[in-house]
Amino acid sequence: MAAAVAAILALLIASPAPPASAATPTRPNIIFFLVDDLSADLLPYMDTVRGLAEGGTTFTDYYVSDSLCCPSRASMFTGQFPHNTGVRTNQGYDRGGYEAFARHEGRTYAVPLHQAGYRTGYLGKYINEYPARPGYQVPDGWDEWHVSAGGGYNEFRYQLTRYIREESGDRRPIAPSKGDYLVDELAQRATGFIERSREHAPGRPFFLQVSPFSPHNRVDVRPGDTEPRFPPAPRDRPKDRFPDGEFPHGDCGGPDCAGIDVTTLPSYDEDTADKPSWVRRAPIEAKRAEELREDFRDRIRMVQSVDDMVGRVLSTLTEPERRNTYVVFASDNGFHLGQHRLVRGKSTAYDHDVRVPLLVRRPVTGERDRLVTGAIAQNVDLFATFLDMAGVAPAIRDSRDGRSLLPLVQGRQVADWRQAALVEHVKPDPRTPGRPDPDADRLRQGNAQPPTYNAVRTAGELYVEYENDPKPEYYNTVADPRQESNDPGNARTASLAGVLRGLTTCGKPGAPDCWTAAHLH
């Protein structure tokens, strides 16, 4: 395994590459890998992704605005918090999904990037309930559009759109799966995008976003189903299930899966007596623990293919392209598997759900230092960051709730950086008319779901206010990094309540801007 990883990393840095195009862009290319439900505890099993830290910047305190798919992705696309996008859940009947997001499609980072001369491509998961049917509408700003038209969570029985501006004309093709694992298919389409960009737009930079569904669970799990809830590629499944198969990862990326145990996760099955009533529950039973153990191992197996995909896409770059490309890796939200006795899901304000990986590999401009920053960053910052990387004017890039992370990526000191992150969440309505919410499985299984809440996270504190509950939740995260000892009567809560009031209204008429509101009193 170590030899294989070394070979991949060497390939990304110094291996011979395909011939470069006649004209190499002066502005950098940008490749953005956005994965689905990837919690920070999976990163140690992703060698290629962790390799981005060499010559890159790791953000240790990167928080999503909501630990739920559509609100989080809407914040990413627009640079605005959910209370400003109006995208609060995953489904249209419930102030969410594509119905709530559609009005923002002309305001995503793709539009100014395309106007700035970038050739743009989007692959994989988009926004829930996007109507990918015959004659589908390609959103403004995208030159290539390869998104799920159904079945993406299954990973094998899916359909993908296949729109290429220079080749498709008025046609809006949809291609069914041929049985290939979806992550592998996205890798192939991503390499095709890079190759077509050389052909169709020589001398122009490109922006490529690759958004696999992995490691999200399947949404069609039924009693007695033998297919895993979290479906890895066949090559990464246990050897005894495929005795004649090829297993380059040892199933779990090198470590023996049998030695990986979900019960070792911080705050697993923690006593929740001091927590709000929606969290309090009995200890996790042995049968459920065994299910979670297998879920954790399958999630690790799933991200082996994501790791492969990242390596495969980056190995497609020519040497000049590699030296002139930002590579960004992040997740839309985290996930829990037994922490705080929360069985399976997300949506909470605890770190395992909202504090997710963000790694940015820089173009080669000199020293390849490995940088680490503890500055508080959020997904609302990605809009401004991508535009800053592309050289778009500050008047456009800084017009939303976030700010560019590029100075931090480059190791520059930034005065007066934000001191507080906002996390806000609206509890989804459990009714499921039409297509089911892909996260409704957690409701059907009786898993605890938080009430509607707003929270503020600083460098050393977490403060949460729940709807219809006069008592807040408070943690000193320096002394209690696992958020195990709730202290709602702490004297700091009054000050943090004021910060939270400013953040939850920021950006509205008559309210402070969100950057000003993100500073402590």
Sequence positions of predicted segments:
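Secretory targeting and sorting signals
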Residues: 1-22
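C-terminal cap/loop subdomain of S1 sulfatases and analogous C-terminal strand-loop tails that border
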Residues: 143-152, 333-339, 380-383, 387-473, ...
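Active-site segment of extracytoplasmic enzymes that catalyze sulfate/phosphate-ester chemistry
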Residues: 32-33, 39-121, 132, 150, ...
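Loop/turn elements at helix/coil->beta-strand transitions in domains of secreted/extracellular proteins
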Residues: 26-31, 55-60, 71, 84, ...
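Active-site-proximal cap/lid insertion segments
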Residues: 40-41, 150-181, 195-204, 209-376, ...
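A short aromatic-rich beta-strand->coil structural motif
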Residues: 30, 36, 113, 125, ...
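Long, internal low-complexity/basic segments
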Residues: 26-28, 35, 271, 277-294, ...
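Short, solvent-exposed turn/loop segments enriched in Gly/Ser/Thr/Pro and often Arg
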Residues: 45-46, 58-81, 88, 122-134, ...
